[in-house]
Design a protein with these regions (language model features):
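Catalytic core of pol beta-like nucleotidyltransferases
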Residues: 1-131, 139-309
């Protein structure tokens, strides 16, 4: 079985990576280094002590030890992987040991099949802290939409889709988008993929199911010729994979065939029939011209917003 987006892998050196793209064949997996063994680390699991590494530190760490892993993201040779952690496989075990995880798991299970639910992030590898957020994975767009609707409508004492203002402010600072706070919140609130469980934040993350994996278009991952930055206005024609990575928006535009977002900030930003305004890098490939948002980690000067909200 191939790795999927949001799986984790552990290498022979006990380095823990998050998988950031679907396995499209080849000898390596596109990942990002998250945790490394450290005798003085503040994260502890059955594997020992670890510390979490930030974006820049992850590149420095690999540059010094495995420079061959470095590309646009971190490419881990499949032969160096000793363990693959799958969100759906690990969730029942994690839920049995954690009350908050179990509560959200049981809540979601009342609306979608249990085998379509997983957990990723620090909980997946057992390195969560007491204040860690919960990152749940939902497989398949139909199930993802059902889970979002359930969370958005939840108003009980434990699980709720209503976030306090302080949490919205924290999310805005974390994302640091090229949008005003008011515009950011207007887009985020209707996505319905965020909630809290007894005061702890959780979110729902989409991953393709088996049938949707058959529709994976490798051309969306091709590196095209960069033409320059541009701002466009266009109607969204298709958005089935708007919550995927990359988020895909087919648009009605005389030159641009689709808008791709490689930053999660602009996933699920618009629906079919809406008019969007987007700024990013125009890329030309052998089969299309597209606008790419998220060409850098910070995505400065790049954004997507719906003009229909």
């Amino acid at each position: 079985m191939r790795a999927r987006l949001r799986d984790f892998v552990i290498t022979e050196q006990d380095w823990i990576f998050a998988v950031v793209a679907y396995d499209r064949g080849g000898e390596g997996l596109e990942c990002f280094l998250r945790y490394v063994p450290d005798a003085h680390g503040d994260r502890v699991s059955a594997r020992g002590r670890y510390r979490k590494v930030g974006f820049e530190e992850a590149y420095e760490f690999l540059r010094a030890r495995r420079p061959e892993y470095l590309d646009t993201v971190h490419t881990v040779p499949k032969g160096a992987i000793k363990e693959l952690l799958r969100p759906a496989t690990q969730l029942p075990r994690i839920a049995a040991r954690n009350e908050k995880v179990r509560a959200v798991y049981e809540f979601l299970s009342r609306h979608i099949p249990q085998d379509r639910i997983g957990i990723t992030g620090s909980y997946l590898c057992g390195l969560h802290a007491p204040d860690s957020d919960l990152d749940f994975v939902i497989y398949g767009r139909e199930q993802f939409d059902a889970a979002r609707a359930a969370v958005a409508g939840a108003r009980n004492a434990a699980v709720t889709g209503e976030l306090p203002e302080a949490l919205w402010q924290r999310l805005y600072r974390k994302r640091n988008p090229e949008l005003s706070y008011e515009v950011f919140i207007a887009h985020e609130k209707r996505k319905g993929h965020r909630g809290t469980i007894s005061g702890t934040y959780f979110d729902l993350l989409y991953v393709r199911d088996d049938a949707e994996l058959q529709l994976l278009d490798r051309r969306n991952y091709e590196k095209g010729e960069r033409v320059g930055y541009r701002t466009i206005t266009a109607e969204v024609l298709e958005a089935s994979f708007a919550f995927d990575s990359p988020a895909i928006y087919a648009v009605d535009h005389p030159e641009i065939a689709k808008v791709l977002s490689f930053t999660h900030t602009y996933a699920g930003q618009a629906v079919v029939g809406e008019t969007i305004k987007a700024r990013g890098m125009v890329e030309r490939t052998s089969h299309e011209t597209r606008l790419v948002v998220g060409t850098t980690r910070e995505a400065r000067g790049e954004w997507i917003r719906s003009l229909s909200l």
